[in-house]
Curated annotation (Swiss-Prot):
InterPro entries: ATP-synt_VA_C, ATP-synth_a_Xtn, ATP_synth_asu-like_sf, ATPase_a/bsu_AS, ATPase_F1/V1/A1_a/bsu_N, ATPase_F1/V1/A1_a/bsu_N_sf, ATPase_F1/V1/A1_a/bsu_nucl-bd, ATPase_F1/V1_b/a_C. PROSITE patterns: ATPASE_ALPHA_BETA. Keywords: ATP synthesis, ATP-binding, Hydrogen ion transport, Ion transport, Nucleotide-binding, Translocase, Transport. Produces ATP from ADP in the presence of a proton gradient across the membrane. The V-type alpha chain is a catalytic subunit. Its EC number is 7.1.2.2. CDD domains: ATP-synt_V_A-type_alpha_C, ATP-synt_V_A-type_alpha_N, V_A-ATPase_A. Signal peptide: none annotated. One of its GO terms (molecular function) is proton-transporting ATP synthase activity, rotational mechanism. This is V-type ATP synthase alpha chain. It comes from Clostridium perfringens (strain 13 / Type A). ATP binds at residues 232-239. Belongs to the ATPase alpha/beta chains family. GO terms for biological process: proton motive force-driven plasma membrane ATP synthesis. One of its GO terms (cellular component) is proton-transporting ATP synthase complex.
């Protein structure tokens, strides 16, 4: 270990000399208290260090000790249901060690619990040949997560010894005989956060990650292994969209990174998730969740680390063969941390003061999402879906963070302040948002939900776009200038907006909608349009069509529970009989 000396302190940036043996991205201990920092720049024997803790009280002349290791996370049983800070220190253990409700300086705690024993069940046996990624056994971590213990990267050989029983994360569970001698394996492995975990090959995402949110699943789906951005101004509902996707998203593991946002939002997650039941397993949502909290009052430098810590944990579960989603709320705060460090390093600023490498750093993060075949004999398939919130100042999506993000991701859920002020939630603007996975996801929906899913979706989207065009005419010359056919289109588009796209996150039946229910709801609304068109052709007045009692039942169909979904078929039958009755009574042609 090499010791240097501090010559400059500037907020979270510390410059030390005598560091000629250190490397970029080495972890260092700064000052007498041993604050954790990371070298981000070397100039001769001078190292620029970003410190992940509060630097008040540190001054020139204090020692800096290099560890010679990159910033790494501990991966093993104990991750699920835990809450970490940006550099993977468990907040509950931290609070006990520091005896304080706030982050104290220089407190060292292990990421994974060293006392807790986990029941290890071997699946490999003595004499088996193993290499990186092969599963040698399992630990039932929670009721829903079976933690597969994998051979670490770089280890290849024959199992010499393997034990069953209860072990902590540091005890030896197996010995592998390699060309370089015997290698002891434990339940835990370490991995540097800035380096993506290796895999056998990448796959094309073909399956949608269903979220139970109608506007997302029907109109702007994201694939398992895809990347999505949620930009929007303050108060438009970014965090609620992220929470909804984290709660109801069709993934087996959720990693939620609160990066520079309010502490109360992480408290909401901690309060709500344990009480909510996963619709697939019936267990608490917390039993599949890892939380990383790096709130706005925590050290700025740790925001950058928190994003990498989160994606590394997500990749670890992906390698086990799980589908994982990672929520980053918000990447703008992370970019602001980059901007602050860049300014203190006196680098040449780019757009709006952000560093020139903002785009490549964002790409480093989002490109670690994807669907892959993991290393190992059994060819496990896993996926990481990355969903990042972006908070552009004033909702201006032409600013650098949003633009750099949109160049990388394939799904854009644009939140609209005007919709939010009208109390339309989720406030995703259907005219500006897009999904480049639409065609592939449409094929999957046609094959697995209903063969006319794509046709219904296209028809509904065309109606919404036509409504926007007709609204211009209505503003100029009024509703009376429109033909009955156009007025019907406006009424159906209004029904799509209010009865389908609008969704109440706090209503037990409306907060989550299965794909089957989504199809039946959209089919009901568009069937009303088709039947009404037949009635208009037969000479029935539009006012009579719009006053049909069945319209109220269609509007309230969103509140039908998943168990009583067959009631929608009854509404469809009622709709057809009421329309046929109107047509038989006749209208303008019989007058």
């Amino acid at each position: 270990m090499k010791t240097g000396k501090i010559i400059k302190v500037s907020g979270p940036l510390v410059v030390a000399e005598g560091m000629d043996e250190a490397n970029v991205y080495d972890v260092v201990k700064v000052g007498e208290k041993g604050l954790i920092g990371e070298i981000i720049e070397m100039r001769g024997d001078k190292a620029s260090i970003q410190v992940y803790e509060e630097t008040s009280g540190i001054g020139p002349g204090d020692p800096v000790i290099t560890t010679g290791e990159p910033l790494s996370v501990e991966l093993g049983p104990g991750l699920i249901e835990s809450m970490f800070d940006g550099i993977q220190r468990p907040l509950d253990a931290f609070m006990k060690a520091a005896n304080s409700a706030f982050l104290s300086k220089g407190v060292e705690v292990k990421s994974l619990n060293r006392e807790k024993k986990w029941p290890f069940v071997p699946t490999a046996k003595v004499g088996d040949k193993v290499s990186a990624g092969d599963v040698i056994g399992t630990v039932q971590e929670t009721a829903v997560v079976l933690h597969r213990i994998m051979v670490p990267f770089g280890v290849e050989g024959t199992i010499k010894e393997i034990k069953a029983g209860d072990f902590n994360v540091e005890e030896v569970i197996a010995v592998v005989e390699t060309e370089k001698g015997d290698k002891n394996l434990t339940l835990m492995q370490k991995w540097p956060v800035r380096k993506g975990r290796p895999y056998a090959r990448k796959l094309n995402p073909v399956e949608p990650m269903t979220t139970g949110q109608r506007v997302i699943d029907t109109f702007f789906p994201v694939a398992k292994g895809g990347a999505a951005a949620v930009p929007g101004p303050f108060g438009a509902g970014k965090t609620v969209v992220q929470h909804q996707v984290a709660k109801w998203g069709d993934t087996e593991i959720v990693v939620y990174v609160g990066c520079g946002e309010r502490g109360n939002e992480m408290t909401d997650v901690l309060n709500e998730f344990p009480e909510l039941k996963d619709p697939k397993t019936g267990e608490s949502l917390m039993k599949r969740t890892v939380l990383i909290a790096n709130t706005s009052n925590m050290p700025v430098a740790a925001r950058e680390a928190s994003i990498y810590t989160g994606i590394t944990i997500a990749e670890y579960f992906r390698d086990m063969g799980y589908s994982v989603s990672i929520m980053a709320d918000s990447t703008s705060r992370w970019a602001e941390a980059l901007r602050e460090m860049s300014g203190r390093l006196e680098e040449m600023p780019g757009d709006e003061g952000y560093p020139a490498y903002l785009g490549s750093r964002l790409a480093d993060y989002y490109e670690r999402a994807g669907k892959v075949v993991a290393l190992g004999k059994d060819g496990r398939e896993g996926a990481v879906t990355a969903i990042g919130a972006v908070s552009p100042p004033g909702g201006d999506i032409s600013e650098p963070v949003t633009q750099s993000t949109l160049r990388i991701v394939k799904v854009f859920w644009g939140l609209d302040a005007q919709l939010a002020y009208k109390r339309h939630f989720p406030s995703i603007n259907w005219l500006t948002s897009y999904s480049l996975y639409l065609e592939k996801m449409g094929e999957w929906m046609d094959a697995h939900v209903a063969d006319d899913w794509s046709a219904l979706r296209t028809e509904a989207m065309a109606l919404l776009q036509e409504e926007a065009n007709l609204e211009e005419i209505v503003r100029l010359v009024g509703m009376d200038a429109l033909s009955e056919g156009d007025r019907l289109k406006l009424e159906v588009a209004k029904s799509i907006r209010e009865d389908y796209l609008q969704q109440n996150a706090f209503h037990e039946n409306d907060t989550y909608t299965s794909l089957n229910k989504q199809y039946k709801m959209l089919n009901l609304i568009l069937s009303f349009k088709h039947e009404a068109e037949k009635a208009l052709e037969a000479g029935v007045y539009l006012d009579k069509v719009l006053k049909l009692p069945v319209r109220d039942r269609i509007a309230r169909s969103k509140y039908i529970s998943e168990e009583e979904i067959s009631k929608m078929d009854d509404i469809l039958v009622e709709l057809k009989s009421e329309m046929n009755k109107l047509i038989s009574e006749g209208g303008v042609l019989n007058a």
